[in-house]
Structures are given as structure tokens and as C-alpha cells.
Curated annotation (Swiss-Prot):
Start-end of Polar residues biased regions: 140-171
Topological category with respect to the lipid bilayer: Multi-pass membrane protein
Family: Belongs to the shisa family.
Signal sequence coordinates: none
InterPro entries, sorted: Shisa, Shisa_N
Listed name of the protein: Protein shisa-like-2A
Presence of keyword Transmembrane: yes
Spans through the membrane: 48-68, 70-90
Organism: Mus musculus (Mouse)
Segments for region (Disordered): 98-189
GO cellular component terms given for this protein: membrane
Localization (cell): Membrane
């Protein structure tokens, strides 16, 4: 680079005449012409691109490095936390499939095939004092014939249901589940 800056048109569209470096009243060490096509100035470093002191640029660079490194650390911590939580979630799941509980099946007199033995089976049970769905038509006629009878407040009509008990091969589970028998007037409050 030389010490002579040619004329140029500034960003404000003003024509600036050429000048030689160093400028009168300027720094004696600024012997080079630096800058861009729309802004030229005298400088002491021919590879300088901005008319700022180097200290300002170093602080800007250090701030950018600190900001980027902080962002990288936060992102890395987030990724590690997500991976650890996924690992803990997957490793804490039980390896065997558990029995979901009572199964809803229609009651009937179907025999089970031999390949279904040992699996969860629904055993229809009749609870004393409660009629099954198959007996609902006969109980409706019985209720219609007794419409004129008075019902005591302790003996209210009850819904009809069929209890289904699921048996499974889980170690430690009871083989039989006892079903409480309600009294003649229903459960005691």
C-alpha cells in the first residue's frame, strides 16, 4: 500500500478529493492509505480494514468467544441431560409385560383350546343374591308381579352384574379370590 489515497465518493454521495498520508495534524506513524472504496483514511498498519483501534477489536473478539463458549456449554449440558433422562426412562421400564388387570369378555360356555392354557383366563362367577344377565328376563317378570309390594328403605333395588375374575401365572398371586357375599338386603352402609 502507498501513502497516497486517491479521490473517492463517500456513502453520503459526496466526492472526497485525494490526499497523501500522513495528514497534516494527524499521527506521524499513519503513513499508509487504508479503507474501502467509499471511505479512506491514513493508518499505521497496511492490513487494517477498520478505522478503530485494535484494542476495541480484541475486546469484541474476546466477548464473542466468551458468548459462543457459554452457548456451547449450555447446549452440551442440555444434550447430556436429555440423553441421561432417556437412558433412565428406558432402563427403568420393566422387562416383562405385566397383566393389565380384569379382562372384559362375554360369558358363555365356550371351551378353551389347549394352546391357551397358562394364559390369563376369565372365569365367570355368580355372586349370591345377584342375578346374571341371562336371568334378567325372568327377574323382570318377577319384579312386575311384585309391583304392589312395598319396598323397605333398607332393601332397595340393585343393579345386576356378572363378576369376572382373572387368574394368572404371576408368582405370589393368590389362586382364588374371595368375593364377599352381600346380605339379603344388600351391603350394610
Amino acid at each position: 500500500m502507498s501513502g497516497a489515497c486517491s479521490s473517492y465518493v463517500s456513502a453520503e454521495q459526496e466526492v472526497v478529493r485525494g490526499f497523501s498520508c500522513p495528514l497534516p495534524g494527524g499521527e506521524a506513524a499513519a503513513v499508509f492509505c487504508c479503507g474501502f472504496r467509499d471511505h479512506k483514511y491514513c493508518c499505521d498498519d497496511p492490513h487494517s480494514f477498520f478505522p478503530y483501534e485494535h484494542n476495541y477489536m480484541w475486546w469484541l473478539s474476546i466477548g464473542a468467544l466468551v458468548g459462543l463458549s457459554t452457548a456451547a456449554v449450555v447446549l452440551l449440558a442440555f444434550l447430556i441431560t436429555a440423553c441421561v433422562l432417556c437412558y433412565l426412562f428406558i432402563s427403568s421400564k420393566p422387562q416383562t409385560k405385566l397383566d393389565p388387570g380384569l379382562s372384559l369378555q362375554t360369558t358363555g360356555s365356550k371351551e378353551m383350546s389347549p394352546d391357551h392354557h397358562g394364559l390369563n383366563t376369565a372365569i365367570p362367577m355368580e355372586v349370591p343374591g345377584v342375578s346374571s344377565p341371562r336371568q334378567s328376563s325372568s327377574s323382570n317378570t318377577h319384579l312386575e308381579s311384585n309391583k304392589k309390594q312395598t319396598v323397605s328403605p333398607t332393601c332397595l333395588p340393585q343393579n345386576q352384574f356378572m363378576a369376572t375374575v382373572t387368574a394368572s401365572n404371576i408368582p405370589g398371586s393368590p389362586d382364588e379370590i374371595s368375593v364377599p357375599t352381600p346380605g339379603p338386603h344388600g351391603p350394610v352402609p
